[in-house]
A protein has these predicted regions:
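Long, distal/terminal scaffolding or interaction modules
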Residues: 1-245
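N-terminal capping/small domains of soluble enzymes
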Residues: 2-60, 209-337, 476, 487, ...
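Catalytic cores of large soluble enzymes that bind and process phosphate-bearing ligands
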Residues: 10, 14, 193, 234, ...
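Structural motif
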Residues: 59-61, 79-80, 98-99, 117-119, ...
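Charged, low-complexity surface patches
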Residues: 64, 159, 377, 435-436, ...
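Conserved active-site and cofactor/substrate-binding residues in soluble primary-metabolism enzymes
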Residues: 75, 94, 108, 113, ...
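Alpha/beta enzyme core
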Residues: 85, 104, 142, 304-434, ...
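Gly/Ser/Thr/Ala-enriched C-terminal appendages of enzymes
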Residues: 146, 153, 161-237, 421-426, ...
Length: 525
């Protein structure tokens, strides 16, 4: 078996070579082939992943061999046929591509698809059609557990047996099963097909070998009361009870220049993003940071040089935050972004191979060598840092508001221990995603604790107000650096921090102001 890093490199190279050929082949109505030599001799692929993302209209591809995860994801049109097996997330976030897998497909086939069709001719793994919003998924052969889980629309047809918990959490769409079906999940209705439905479905399938018989059953969501989730438990504090001191250096002059610049991505091959202050504003849309003709020149200058973490319409300096809610927009928006962040909490749990497949697909859609960020809850920071280092991403960012209720002060020693264990000696930076708008003091405290980059919600949705907040935060950070006698944010260290009360000292392990040492329980074995 080839080394996984070799597989990733091969996969990226295949996508890079295919890119310029797709448009020309579509204009000539030609089929591009993967797994054959130029002379037509078969050379089956073995494990290549993330292949052929965001296929455009008119593209026609055929692949031979056993492929990995996230193949033909984010499709916009055209067709993709696999003569062999496919891994997990085949055709995920499909918006119009016709995908055919002539043998078996893995878990999460058709995940979050909204249009197009996917046909698998020898069964699938678990969670086929999960989070599906539209389109058609046809499976011949057995399918695993939770088929159609969380689906909102579309049609799934299974000619074979399905596993336990079919339709779990579905709120729309139909699952037609021509085979054995266990009792459906709560809130799901199992009923026979009506004659008109059989005709309508078979007309939609347009393939006699896949037509459903009249004795097939249909699963649909039942009407039920909708309970609006109240959201995560928020953290129990902020960073106001942590002070900044320097017992060694005198203060700098009030007019002395200090360095507050930070980079996203420190590898030589990465197109790093420069931040005037180590802070990314977390916004819904990059258009919020796009000045118009009436915006003052100084505000325009601030907005243009500050990257942001956005879910939609990224600018060339922005990092696009990718989760289930905007997977369908990846092909449209990601090429314009200066980097991307994968929200692991918003996507299904993935093993190393599946995450590699997603990263290959996204890197192939994005601009060349942009920085990559992984985001996950603070309670899973050890796993996050280990995965980030293994996959060679640029930033591992822990989200404070993950439902655990852990405070920012309690997160600091967790961050420090995990960074030392997993990120030391790597080029992966440690980040923190806050649930409140950070100040310059907050940034100084976090930088001194070993955090390289902070993202947080903006205090306002108005672009001009955001510009004033960003400039004020930079000035506040510079003021604290001058006050404690440091010329650069890179010189901040844990020795500059003091807990201002016992509760903060107890959970953070910082020296208690006045006592001069951490509380005794931090030394207990």
């Amino acid at each position: 078996m080839a080394d996984i890093h070799e597989v990733v490199t091969r996969s990226l190279n295949i996508n890079e070579k295919l890119g310029p050929r797709l448009k020309a082949a579509a204009e000539q109505n030609a089929i591009l082939r993967i797994g054959w030599t130029n002379a037509g001799d078969p050379v089956p692929k073995n494990g290549e992943l993330g292949l052929c993302p965001a296929l455009p209209e008119g593209a026609r591809l055929r692949a031979l061999g056993v492929l990995g995860s996230w193949v033909a994801a984010f499709g916009q049109g055209g067709s993709f046929t696999i003569q062999g097996d496919a891994g997990s997330f085949l055709g995920a976030a499909n918006l119009g591509t016709t995908v055919v897998c002539e043998q078996m497909a893995g878990h999460f086939t058709g995940y979050a698809m909204a249009d197009g069709s996917i046909t698998v001719l020898d069964g699938t793994g678990d969670d086929a059609g999960a989070a599906m919003r539209g389109g058609i998924l046809v499976i011949r052969g057995a399918s695993g557990a939770r088929i159609g889980g969380g689906m909102e629309g579309g049609l799934i047809v299974v000619h074979g047996d399905v596993g336990p918990d079919p339709g779990a959490g579905m709120s729309g769409g139909r699952i037609v099963i021509n085979g054995r079906c266990p009792p459906p999940a709560p809130g799901v209705l199992l009923r026979p097909l009506e004659a008109d439905e059989v005709k309508e479905i078979n007309a939609t399938l347009d393939d006699e070998s896949l037509h459903v018989p009249s004795d097939a059953v249909c699963l649909m969501a039942q009407e039920k009361l909708h309970f609006e989730h109240g959201g995560f438990v928020v953290s129990s504090g902020d960073l106001s009870q942590i002070g900044l001191i320097n017992e060694e250096n005198p203060p700098l002059r009030t007019y002395q220049t200090v360095d507050t610049v930070a980079l996203i991505g420190t590898r030589d091959e990465v197109k790093s993003l420069a931040l005037p202050v180590p802070l990314l504003a977390n916004l819904v849309s990059g258009s919020t940071m796009s000045p118009d003709g009436n915006t003052p020149a100084d505000v325009t200058s601030i907005l243009n040089r500050h990257p942001a973490l956005v879910e939609a319409e990224p600018r060339a300096v922005d990092v696009m935050l990718i989760g289930q809610s905007n997977l369908l927009d990846v092909a449209s928006w990601l090429p314009d972004a200066g980097g991307f962040a994968v929200d692991l909490d918003e996507l299904p749990p993935m093993n190393a191979e599946q995450l590699d497949g997603l990263l290959v697909a996204l890197r192939s859609v994005a601009s060349t060598n942009v920085p990559v960020v992984l985001i996950q809850g603070i309670s899973r920071i050890q796993a996050l840092h280990a995965r980030a280092a293994y996959h060679g991403v640029d930033v591992a960012m822990a989200r404070i508001e993950d439902g655990s209720g852990l405070s920012e002060a309690a997160a600091l020693p967790m961050m420090g221990r995990s960074k030392k264990e997993h990120l030391q000696g790597t080029m992966t930076q440690a980040g923190l995603l806050l649930g409140f708008a950070a100040s310059g003091h907050d940034l100084a405290v976090l930088m001194a604790s070993g955090v390289d980059l902070v993202a947080c919600v903006a205090p306002t949705a108005d672009g001009e107000d955001i510009a004033y907040w960003l400039q004020g935060t930079q000035d506040d950070l510079a003021h604290h650096l001058r006050r404690i006698g440091l010329s650069s944010v890179d010189l901040l260290d844990r020795k500059h921090l003091r807990a201002l009360d016992q509760e903060t000292a107890a959970v953070s392990g910082l020296r208690l102001a006045g006592y001069g040492r951490p509380l005794p329980h931090w030394f207990a074995r």
